[in-house]
């Protein structure tokens, strides 16, 4: 197995830098070495061009190495092999084969710098030199005398090595806050805003280093391989000039015609249900590209233009997100209404000159629930069918509740969603005491009236659903979708809007009503936003939009 941290490789790199004829050739040699690097990048960078150094200690170490190796600092470029090491008049036997590693040398040099006396440093060098070749010792001398980089600046080394140091270290994502007044976007960003389609998929941060790729989720965890199958090859083709980058993107499952499939179809089992489906990646931001960082200071306009200049779109596989420049409130409003009329999840609004701010909510997001004073929010009146115990201080309390509705055709209760009560501790305790007499731990064989997937069986189940309370559950979006719940309904971001003591099981929403409500909701939403967008005469947000 290849050892990317072999000090022999470090020696070879240093010699190639010395042998290079000009500055660009040195940069090319360094870049080639790190093209598929898998070692300790931080230590390599510190040995080549340390960010900080102890000048006094390094001067003392340089003098010591000049003495024991019998060479001058200025002669390093012309030194070849067959060096001898002599300490206190005694020759130190050197190794014929290099066995040491970069981490060992890094630790050794730090120990040398931390040693107080010359005699202690000589002792450490004598011990370490016994396992070194003459080339190893020459390279260590180059490191302590600040000659390992052979004239490359610290900025050169940082630029060429840092992408691999950053590799596998995800950057906290920039975030968006809910927007209920479009005017507030232009108040914060008077220079104008970039309005972008919000895709109904999963956010992913893409790292490329040479031929290697890593994918991280919104929570900075590795993305399962089945969700990014084929993306490496398509990204390589889409960015043919890229040596390294960090991109922000959204992955969405699309069918053979390029139409987006419902949220949740990125899962392994769901993918199997769509034989012609595949992953499409929508790129919307650039954090780093070919060694240049665009974090914190670079305007979005510029970052977007970098992407436009570099990408070769692959339709249905790797494309830029649909985005449009807006300068007035009417332009912003029309884009939002037109986008929502297509059934998109929402829009994201960003200042044209805004920087990429990790972990900060500097962007705005708008969904249909944020418009029309919440009149377009989907709600269902559902019955509490079960409960799950919480964790931590809520370990003995009902913390999450299973909501469901009656299928009147089969007279069976189906599950719709799980929801947190949103109550404070005292109120949650009172609610638990109220509901506990109406519930019991389910037996292995579930009652005939209850249709529930095994993964959703609650810790406590209603003894009689007709005696359970009704709650109004709101969500950002409601779709017909066969998933974890048996009703075939998906509620995105469900929450308890209010308790409904005025209703009982007979007046709650049943399955047939829920299905009709979903159809009506989707149709009414599209009609509403299509009407609001009738004066909009710009390009369709479903197509790739270019900045002027």
From Swiss-Prot:
ATP binds at residues 196, 203, 218, 250, 284, 361, 365. Pfam families: DNA_ligase_A_C, DNA_ligase_A_M, DNA_ligase_A_N. InterPro entries: ATP-dep_DNA_ligase, DNA_ligase_ATP-dep, DNA_ligase_ATP-dep_C, DNA_ligase_ATP-dep_cent, DNA_ligase_ATP-dep_CS, DNA_ligase_ATP-dep_N, DNA_ligase_N_sf, NA-bd_OB-fold. One of its GO terms (molecular function) is ATP binding. SUPFAM superfamilies: DNA ligase/mRNA capping enzyme, catalytic domain, Nucleic acid-binding proteins. Its cofactor is a divalent metal cation. The active site is at residue 198. Keywords: ATP-binding, Cell cycle, Cell division, DNA damage, DNA recombination, DNA repair, DNA replication, Ligase, Metal-binding, Nucleotide-binding. Residues 515-548 are annotated as: Disordered. The keyword Ligase applies. One of its GO terms (biological process) is double-strand break repair. Belongs to the ATP-dependent DNA ligase family. This is DNA ligase. It comes from Lymantria dispar multicapsid nuclear polyhedrosis virus (LdMNPV). The lineage of its organism: Viruses, Viruses incertae sedis, Naldaviricetes, Lefavirales, Baculoviridae.
């Amino acid at each position: 197995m290849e050892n990317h941290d072999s000090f022999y490789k470090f020696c070879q790199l240093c010699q190639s830098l010395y042998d290079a004829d000009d500055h660009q050739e040195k940069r090319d040699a360094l870049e080639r070495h790190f093209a598929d690097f898998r070692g300790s990048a931080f230590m390599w960078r510190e040995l080549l061009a340390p960010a900080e150094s102890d000048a006094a200690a390094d001067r003392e170490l340089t003098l010591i190495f000049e003495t024991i190796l019998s060479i001058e600092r200025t002669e390093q470029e012309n030194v070849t092999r067959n060096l001898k090491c002599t300490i206190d008049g005694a020759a130190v036997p050197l190794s014929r084969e290099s066995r040491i590693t970069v981490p060992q040398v890094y630790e050794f040099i730090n120990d040398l710098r931390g040693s107080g006396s010359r005699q202690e440093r000589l002792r450490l060098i004598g011990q370490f030199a016994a396992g070194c070749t003459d080339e190893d010792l020459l390279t260590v001398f180059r490191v302590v005398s600040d000659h390992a980089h052979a004239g490359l600046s610290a900025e050169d080394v940082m630029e060429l090595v840092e992408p691999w140091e950053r590799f596998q270290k995800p950057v906290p994502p920039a975030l968006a806050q809910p927007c209920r007044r479009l005017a507030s976007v232009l108040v914060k960003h008077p220079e104008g805003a970039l309005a972008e389609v919000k895709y109904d998929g999963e956010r992913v941060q893409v790292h490329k280093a040479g031929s290697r790729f890593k994918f991280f989720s919104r929570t900075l965890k590795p993305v399962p391989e089945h969700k990014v199958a084929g993306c490496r090859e398509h990204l390589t083709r889409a960015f043919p000039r890229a040596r390294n980058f960090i991109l922000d993107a959204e992955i969405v499952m699309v069918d053979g015609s390029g139409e987006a499939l419902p949220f949740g179809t990125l899962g392994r089992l769901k993918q199997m249900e769509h034989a012609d489906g595949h992953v499409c990646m929508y790129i919307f931001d650039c954090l780093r590209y070919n060694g240049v960082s665009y974090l914190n200071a670079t305007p979005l306009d510029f970052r977007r233009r970098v992407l436009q200049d570099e990408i070769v779109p692959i339709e249905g596989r790797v494309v830029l997100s649909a985005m449009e420049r807006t300068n007035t409130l009417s332009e912003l409003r029309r884009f939002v209404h037109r986008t929502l009329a297509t059934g998109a999840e929402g829009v994201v609004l960003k200042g044209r000159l805004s920087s990429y701010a990790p972990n900060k909510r500097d962007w705005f997001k708008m969904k249909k629930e944020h418009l029309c004073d919440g009149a377009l929010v989907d709600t269902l009146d559902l019955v509490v069918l079960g409960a799950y115990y919480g964790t931590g201080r809520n370990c003995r309390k009902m913390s999450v509740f299973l909501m469901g509705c009656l299928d009147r055709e089969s007279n069976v209760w189906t599950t719709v969603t799980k929801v947190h009560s949103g109550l404070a501790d005292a109120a949650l305790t009172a609610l638990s005491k109220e509901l506990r007499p109406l519930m019991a731990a389910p037996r292995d064989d579930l009652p005939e009236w209850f249709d529930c997937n095994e993964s959703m069986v609650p810790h406590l189940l209603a003894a009689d659903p007709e005696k359970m309370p009704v709650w109004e559950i709101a969500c950002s979006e409601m779709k017909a979708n066969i998933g974890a719940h048996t009703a075939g309904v998906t509620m995105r971001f469900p929450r308890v809007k209010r308790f409904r003591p005025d209703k009982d099981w007979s007046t709650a929403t049943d399955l047939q009503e829920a299905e009709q409500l979903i159809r009506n909701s989707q149709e009414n939403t599209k009609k509403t936003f299509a009407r609001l967008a009738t004066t909009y005469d710009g390009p369709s947000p479903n197509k790739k939009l270019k900045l002027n």
